[in-house]
Amino acid sequence: MSFLTVSRLAPKLLNSKNATYFLVAARNASASSTNLKDVLADLIPKEQTRIKNFKQQYGKTNIGQITVDMVYGGMRGMKGLVYETSVLDPEEGIRFRGYSIPECQELLPKAPGGEEPLPEGLFWLLVTGQVPTEEQVNWVSKEWAKRAALPSHVVTMLDNFPTNLHPMSQFSAAITALNSESSFARAYSEGVHKTKYWEFIYEDSMDLIAKLPCIAAKIYRNLYREGSSIGAIDSNLDWSHNFTNMLGYSEPQFTELMRLYLTIHSDHEGGNVSAHTSHLVGSALSDPYLSFSAAMNGLAGPLHGLANQEVLVWLTALQKELGGEVSDERMRDYIWNTLKSGRVVPGYGHAVLRKTDPRYTCQREFALKHLPNDPMFKLVAQLYKIVPNVLLEQGKAKNPWPNVDAHSGVLLQYYGMTEMNYYTVLFGVSRALGVLAQLVWSRALGFPLERPKSMSTDGLMTLVGAKSG
């Protein structure tokens, strides 16, 4: 049994008498090395062989049908790409390399005295399929601290952006400008063999993840804190702690929230706009800086990364109209009026999920523990009790349950981060963990240039035998 197989089996056996054995096996699978690149170098040939054998045996096997509705409907439900790091189940929610969010919260290493998983541990899991040890997570923290410094031209660029340029535009532009530092672009121009691509993609990805909090914090300070300094990286602190320090937040609970936030927003399988964009652009052998910058331009779209902002705007309007504490009956009437006016209740529903988003649930649990009496949280909790039943009565929603965006903005507001335009930047910092872990594997497995076949409406009509008149 391979190490990856042991890791994938572990969550299925959590409730069995063999759970301890398998979890120890998963943790010890790479215990001999704290260097992530060394662990990858051992895993990649095994995975290459496994996939080669699978393709040889099943390469011509049909895995589903494509309907006209799928082609016109944003390719929803169409099985069209391989994405290893996470899988989204409509009933269960996201699993990171086979592990649910509650399992990640339980198993991944935490900061001393902390209760939430460290994003460094999740990144190790996404890259290797293995639950890391504390030593391995500490290695990642120190590695990212070592790589965090920004080149002077990027600092100058950030300091000279106009203040009316959206934070996401600044974020994307700065990431693109980091392309000057790309190990992969340099190696490719020098003719490196394709079997070595992954090594340089890995180096660029580690550098980029390390630098993202510095970019994000610089944008925040320039826009909302009069350009004050972000300070220096402390190599003794974890990635999230350094990030919150650079942002200017010293409350330990906010750092714990950031660890949770950066973990749960990291990946959501490969079909969403940001993940698919990075996969597509990366397939052209664009380096990680260009690929991730493109992904961030997708994340900036209102249908992808702005949803938590829209939730807060809606909640604020609701609070203003209805006042403080609101009866369930008045709340129910307000929701019905919203729906009857042709609007939606933001934060409810999901393109894939058909149950409450587990990312919502873990944020709710955080709020119940740390801010149970906050008026905005109480409003969110009241909506959770009422909205699904109203949506079920209406009969239009495929999923009447809350998603991750229904909660995250309220938590950030509670700790003083009220700048809603900035929230998508936090989302972007987190999403790097998933899409860059996959980008390393995409090059390691030799995935080709993505080039699906497009069709015109006339062509589709001809294909299905429809009249074009």
UniProtKB/Swiss-Prot annotation:
The lineage of its organism: Eukaryota, Metazoa, Chordata, Craniata, Vertebrata. Disulfide bonds: none annotated. Citrate synthase is found in nearly all cells capable of oxidative metabolism. One of its GO terms (molecular function) is citrate (Si)-synthase activity. Belongs to the citrate synthase family. Homodimer. The keyword Transmembrane helix does not apply. Residues 1-30 form a transit peptide. The keyword Cell membrane does not apply. It comes from Xiphias gladius. It is an enzyme of class 2 (transferase). NCBIfam families: cit_synth_euk (TIGR01793), PRK09569.1 (NF007128). Key enzyme of the Krebs tricarboxylic acid cycle which catalyzes the synthesis of citrate from acetyl coenzyme A and oxaloacetate. Its main location: mitochondrion. Gene3D superfamilies: Citrate Synthase, domain 1 (1.10.580.10), Cytochrome P450-Terp, domain 2 (1.10.230.10). It comes from the Eukaryota. This is Citrate synthase, mitochondrial. GO terms for cellular component: mitochondrial matrix. Oxaloacetate binds at R359, R431, R451. It catalyses: oxaloacetate + acetyl-CoA + H2O = citrate + CoA + H(+). Its EC number is 2.3.3.1. Keywords: Mitochondrion, Transferase, Transit peptide, Tricarboxylic acid cycle. GO terms for biological process: carbohydrate metabolic process; citrate metabolic process; tricarboxylic acid cycle. Pathway: Carbohydrate metabolism; tricarboxylic acid cycle; isocitrate from oxaloacetate: step 1/2. SUPFAM superfamilies: Citrate synthase. It is found in: Mitochondrion matrix. The active site is at H304, H350, D405.
